[in-house]
């Protein structure tokens, strides 16, 4: 058993990048961070591609990052798994059952998802593959497009829409029905007014109508509205859903489809509702959403949280709303239930349109709560996520992101001061980069997506002389287990990055 306790501090979206004018982290005032990087052992971690279970060259994201951090192994991600399996989609028993039900009911298929090659929430190629199969079975299809502009350039929707239009013009009975920026269709922060706008367009064709999707997008561009924020709208003569219809959600990441799926199946009540009894998802989105899926998830056991629980130790997960699922559901390998002696605290995120308006977000409240819990000396492991660098970085506003970095720096200073003369070891890392690249020089526009840069890995307040090796996100859990003097389970294929001096 250990004499140490650990605080794992995940600075979401904090990468190591070139020191230039577009690196909000390098440009920000952050005296505590500057001191940390000089005083304590540090290395860096790879957060993309095959190092986290993604295709080579694929940028990492928060879900993938937290799954790898918590599981202590490289977890084959849904993108890779689906890429491998979708070539056999015509034989997928779950899709065949779905299709047979539509045919029996004489309905049409509504297929919805993020039309993007960002690889974070979806892949447009998956949508095309499923459309091909539906067309082969002579199913009439209404396509509901969610527009990205966050994991892709802010003004890039016409590229993907053109690909889709070219693809379906040779297929029978396939029509684009609605468009919606992901700001509306993919909200995850319980801002149901946004989700309702997307739902009303999909379910009731209740929104502004355009003849074709490219005209709809250009109309928004003319108003200065980029892809992410395009209001839900209707395309052509789409008239809405009927009870005999079926619905497929093609996003494979769960957190940003839960609200819209719950509206579709009636778990979130709306003023008007169409009841469908034939809905299917790409993967299992939640234990609380009772719909089948095309590609069932893998079962991940002996995660870091499970090892802590099996040793009868107490652990705490804390984050603000935007990243709460990441330190709980994703960190636990896609399991919603809490382990024994696991406590969770959610701090509400600010209710603003975009986080450049409040770059401090709720970091100070998160920090004050952590300090209260440290003083209890109850928890052997505290896992905290600071959302600022990622969520403000996604706005493309470099000045606001610099303010976000300064806020995090102040929070780190408070935590470090609090753990002096305690047995707490502060482990600092990130899940992926973002704030260190804020401008796309090649395309002369703000850069709002994640990056391929490595992220920092630093251990503070450890009373042993050590060096740290470079590694991958899956190496963090084994490193923490070494600090806690707990055995690493065989399922964890990551390695401790600690080298004794």
Swiss-Prot record:
SUPFAM superfamilies: 2,3-Bisphosphoglycerate-independent phosphoglycerate mutase, substrate-binding domain (SSF64158), Alkaline phosphatase-like (SSF53649). InterPro entries: Alkaline_phosphatase_core_sf, BPG-indep_PGM_N, Metalloenzyme, PGAM_B_sf, Pgm_bpd_ind. The active site is at 62 (phosphoserine intermediate). Transmembrane segments: none annotated. Pathway: Carbohydrate degradation; glycolysis; pyruvate from D-glyceraldehyde 3-phosphate: step 3/5. Keywords: Glycolysis, Isomerase, Manganese, Metal-binding. Substrate binds at residues 121, 150-151, 182, 188, 253-256, 323. Its cofactor is Mn(2+). Catalyzes the interconversion of 2-phosphoglycerate and 3-phosphoglycerate. This is 2,3-bisphosphoglycerate-independent phosphoglycerate mutase. The gene is gpmI.
């Amino acid at each position: 058993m250990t004499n140490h306790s650990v605080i794992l501090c995940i600075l979401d979206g904090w990468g190591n990048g070139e020191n230039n004018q577009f690196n909000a982290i390098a440009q920000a005032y952050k005296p505590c961070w500057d001191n940390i990087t000089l005083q304590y052992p540090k290395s860096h971690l790879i957060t993309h591609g095959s190092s986290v279970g993604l295709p080579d060259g694929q940028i990492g994201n928060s879900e993938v990052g937290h799954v790898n951090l918590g599981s202590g192994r490289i977890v084959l991600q849904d993108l890779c798994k689906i890429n491998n399996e979708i070539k056999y989609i015509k034989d997928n028993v779950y899709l065949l059952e779905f299709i047979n039900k539509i045919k029996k009911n004489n309905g049409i298929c509504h297929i919805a998802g993020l039309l993007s090659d960002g690889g974070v929430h979806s892949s447009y190629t998956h949508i095309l593959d499923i459309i091909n199969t539906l067309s082969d079975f002579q199913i009439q299809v209404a396509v509901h497009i969610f527009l990205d502009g966050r994991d892709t350039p802010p003004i890039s929707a016409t590229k993907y829409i053109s690909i889709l239009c070219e693809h379906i013009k040779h297929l029978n009975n396939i029509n684009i029905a609605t468009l919606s920026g992901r700001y509306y269709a993919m909200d995850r922060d319980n801002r149901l007014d946004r989700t309702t706008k997307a739902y009303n367009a999909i379910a009731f064709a209740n929104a502004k109508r355009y003849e074709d999707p490219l005209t709809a997008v250009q109309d928004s561009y003319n108003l200065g509205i980029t892809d992410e924020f395009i209001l839900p709208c209707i395309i052509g003569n789409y008239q809405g859903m009927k009870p005999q219809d079926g619905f497929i959600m093609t996003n494979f990441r769960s957190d940003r489809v839960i609200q819209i799926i719950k509206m579709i199946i009636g778990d979130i009540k709306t003023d008007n509702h169409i009841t469908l009894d034939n809905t299917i998802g790409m993967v299992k989105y939640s234990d609380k959403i009772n719909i089948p899926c095309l590609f069932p998830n893998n079962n991940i056991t002996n995660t870091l949280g499970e090892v802590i629980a099996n040793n009868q130790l107490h652990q705490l997960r804390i984050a603000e709303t935007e990243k709460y699922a990441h330190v709980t559901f994703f960190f636990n390998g896609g399991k919603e239930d809490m382990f024994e002696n696991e406590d969770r605290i959610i701090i509400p995120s600010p209710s603003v349109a975009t986080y450049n308006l409040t770059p401090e977000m709720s970091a100070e409240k998160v920090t004050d709560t952590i300090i209260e819990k440290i003083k209890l000396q109850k928890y052997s492991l505290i896992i905290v996520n600071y959302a600022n660098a990622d969520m403000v970085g996604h706005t493309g506003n470099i000045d606001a992101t610099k303010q976000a970095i300064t806020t995090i720096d102040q929070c780190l200073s408070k935590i470090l001061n609090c753990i002096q003369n305690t047995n707490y070891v502060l482990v600092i890392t990130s899940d992926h980069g973002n704030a260190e690249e804020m401008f796309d020089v090649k395309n002369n526009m703000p850069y709002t997506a994640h990056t391929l840069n490595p992220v920092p890995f630093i251990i503070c307040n450890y009373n042993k002389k050590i060096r740290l090796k470079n590694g991958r996100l899956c190496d963090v859990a084994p490193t923490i287990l070494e600090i806690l003097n707990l055995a690493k389970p065989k399922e964890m294929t990551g390695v401790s990055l600690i080298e004794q001096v």
